[in-house]
Amino acid sequence: MSYFVAPFEVSSKSLGAPLKVHFVHLYSAIATRHSDTIDVVFLVDGLKATVAVSCATLAELRGREGINLADQQLADIAALYLRQTLERGYEATEAELFLRGEQLRALGRELGYL
């Protein structure tokens, strides 16, 4: 499968120069990190940044609400979350960013997926 998130730049007063962000890949972290997440990996100025999307939240969306987000939609939601996080001045390459619950739903609604 092939997913595409267009490269983008993020600016923030606290970040200094604009940061260049590139999507790398999306994969299940259960096998690689023993984490119950779907990891969406980006490079932020060449440094790895991971947005970990909660599998429990995805299962809840599918089970209770009948919504099944496609991988491309997850990549888009993760990119928006990373963009917003960087715009607030957070250094996203220092730790994983966890995306779950209402936060994921809000971003999905913002993109028109929910």
Kindly give the residue locations of the regions a language model identified.
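A short, structured beta-strand/loop element
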Residues: 38-63
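Short, charged/polar N-terminal "headpieces" of proteins
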Residues: 1-47
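Acidic, low-complexity intrinsically disordered segments
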Residues: 2-18, 60-114
